[in-house]
């Protein structure tokens, strides 16, 4: 997984599931999508924070729309929906180059100020 576009309130990653991400039945484990979506939703919130301010995911809701393919580069996009003093709410999606949706998530992050 690697970021390739970052703007205020948004981040794009490229991600590819390989053999390490397979479940016992041979398909890509849902935990792969969960990890990718947790990362992009959190990183989107992170783009809105001042230096020295942290965050932690307190809620992650994932909808699997279709099986994640193995060995295909996918795009993961995280976007902030709402920011307040204590919470950041964001959404994420995993799509392919044609825009086909594989998974969608919403996340709530607690803002941690020192």
List where the protein language model places each region.
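Active-site helix/loop of acyl-thioester processing domains in fatty-acid/polyketide metabolism
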Residues: 31-51
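Hydrophobic beta-strand-centered segment that forms part of the acyl-chain substrate-binding groove
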Residues: 44-75
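Catalytic strand-loop segment that frames the active site of acyl-thioester-processing enzymes
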Residues: 1-28
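Conserved beta-strand segments that form the floor/walls of ligand-binding pockets within enzyme
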Residues: 12, 16, 27, 57-63, ...
């Amino acid at each position: 997984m690697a970021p390739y576009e970052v703007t205020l309130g948004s981040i794009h990653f490229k991600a590819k599931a390989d053999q390490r991400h397979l479940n016992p039945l041979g398909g890509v484990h849902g935990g792969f999508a969960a990890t990718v979506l947790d990362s992009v939703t959190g990183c989107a919130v992170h783009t809105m924070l001042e230096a020295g301010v942290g965050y932690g995911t307190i809620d992650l809701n994932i909808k699997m729309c279709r099986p994640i393919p193995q060995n295909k580069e996918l795009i993961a996009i995280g976007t902030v929906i709402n920011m307040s003093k204590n919470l950041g709410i964001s959404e994420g999606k995993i799509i392919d180059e044609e825009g086909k949706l594989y998974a969608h998530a919403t996340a709530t992050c607690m803002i941690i100020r020192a």
